[in-house]
Regions:
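Phosphodiester-processing cores and adjacent nucleic acid-binding clamps
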Residues: 1-295
């Protein structure tokens, strides 16, 4: 639908240079995540963005495989994508897909928060954790290719997000990996915050949602600067916004629609229908046969 809408508007004034990119937010999991031990494992978020039709095909295939591996966790359907599946898919799609570390629900931000206290209390152990984070980033750069994996910062006044943003900036410098700024948009406009809150509470009434999702809407550059400049400085924030253009420049215009391709089925027109029926009736599944002749 997004591509159809774009196709109908792309020639209008104000749409010059606009691009639509499609992707998927997946659960990127280790292979010990199963229905049996699902309560002892997390389902970390990860972002995939298709830069062209071939990349979109790869993401679709990966999503199909994840659904085959699905299971219920609490009241939610979980569809894990294993690291090995991502590796296998990306082996054929380098340059077609961009990856991003995602929100606080991602594997890297979660690990940074999980061991935050060690930074002050046990520097030696924290150094090992920090190295594992650098290794994870290097692993992603290897899978996606140089310049196709990004660290994702997000605007927020929450202490957890501010801490993670600072650490991602440090990782960016130490691993030579570009960072971007996104808003993890769950709703369109700031005025929609209350509606979004009511929607979430209708599903999980005891869940605190207001503060966590207060900044997860589509912001202007000015709004992002208002949220982030005091913590990181104008130039750092502007660089994160400018880096999103690295993805824009890689993205191609593509369509998902195809021309109707009716297969050619050769028929022996010399054989009457009755002869054909007797010849093939045993190959018709009983369920189909019953449906055909129930009247």
């Amino acid at each position: 639908d997004a591509l159809k809408y774009y196709d109908s508007h792309k020639d209008l004034e104000g749409w010059e240079g606009f691009k639509v990119v499609l992707g998927n937010e997946i659960y990127l999991c280790t292979e010990d995540v199963t229905a049996e031990n699902k309560f002892n494992n997390r389902y970390p978020h990860f972002i995939l963005v298709a830069l062209n039709a071939n990349g979109h095909k790869g993401i679709r295939e990966l999503s199909t495989k994840a659904w085959i591996q699905n299971s219920f966790m609490h009241v939610m359907m979980r569809v894990p994508t294993y690291y090995s599946d991502l590796e296998e898919m990306m082996a054929n799609h380098k340059g077609d897909i961009v990856g991003s570390s995602a929100c606080l629900g991602g594997a890297l931000p979660h690990r940074l928060l999980q061991f935050q206290d060690l930074e002050k209390n046990n520097p030696k152990e924290y150094a090992e954790i920090w190295q594992s984070c650098k290794d994870w980033v290097a692993y992603m750069n290897e899978i996606f290719g140089e310049g196709y994996f990004f660290l994702e910062l997000q605007p927020s006044h929450m202490a957890e997000q501010i801490y993670v943003n600072h650490k991602l900036l440090q990782l960016s410098e130490e691993t030579n990996t570009s960072y971007i700024i996104t808003t993890d948009a769950h709703y369109l406009k700031k005025e929609d915050r209350e509606i979004h809150k009511i929607f979430l509470e209708s599903q999980e009434g005891d869940r605190e949602v207001d503060d966590f999702y207060s900044t997860t809407y589509i912001m202007s550059e000015e709004e992002i600067h208002e949220y982030m400049d005091e913590y990181y400085g104008y130039d750092v924030v502007q660089k994160g916004l400018d880096n999103t253009m690295l993805i824009y420049e890689k993205a191609e215009y593509y369509k998902l629609t195809k021309d109707l391709d009716i297969p050619y089925i050769p028929l022996n027109t010399n054989e009457p229908d009755k002869v054909l029926y007797e010849k093939y009736k045993d190959k018709i599944p009983k369920k189909v046969y019953d449906a055909m002749y129930r009247f």
